[in-house]
A protein has these predicted regions:
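Acidic-enriched and Gly/Ser
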Residues: 1-161
Length: 161
């Protein structure tokens, strides 16, 4: 299967990452489909768009938007798949829904930068991290890896990579 403008991907393990292995037994930590924190974001590229230029190749691992694999309830309470859904193993992903890709090393897509938090040294603060600063871990080339940067409020979104 190929798409003209979209990537074709498959989830790495499953649509949701809501289980943990504890003592050899599987524990389900969340049963809600609407909680974005438990939606899988890792995928493997099955096909690239036929139109456009991309550094992403078939077989690369990618980090996608949480709504790609997510299920939701419509206004009538009926459970639906995302618009990316083709079948349980196949999803169409728009280029702007891919944030990172990995052949051998993680690379950020154009327009994205991934920042690790800086631990707070302020003994009077209850915050574990310094607000609005971080160290660049994955970059699109606009800033250097390892740089200490500042960013605007509400421009951050947590990813665990």
């Amino acid at each position: 299967m190929k798409s003209v403008y979209n990537f074709v991907v498959t989830p790495v393990k499953s649509r949701y990452n809501n289980t943990k292995d504890i003592g050899g037994k599987e524990l389900i930590v969340n049963t809600e489909i609407f909680n974005h924190q438990y939606v899988s974001r890792e995928a493997i590229v099955k096909a690239i768009p036929t139109v456009g230029d991309t550094d992403i190749k078939v077989g690369d691992k990618v980090i996608v938007h949480h709504n790609v694999f997510r299920r939701w309830h419509n206004q009538h309470g009926i459970e639906k798949n995302s618009r990316s859904y083709i079948d349980e193993e196949t999803y169409l992903v728009q280029p702007d829904q891919i944030f990172l890709y990995k052949d051998t090393e993680w690379q950020a897509q154009k327009g994205y930068c991934f920042v690790a938090p800086v631990k707070s040294t302020d003994k009077l603060s209850v915050d574990k991290e310094k607000p609005l600063v971080g160290i660049v871990k994955h970059t699109d080339g606009t800033v250097n890896k390892g740089d200490l940067i500042g960013f605007r409020p509400s421009s951050e979104y947590e990813f665990i990579i």
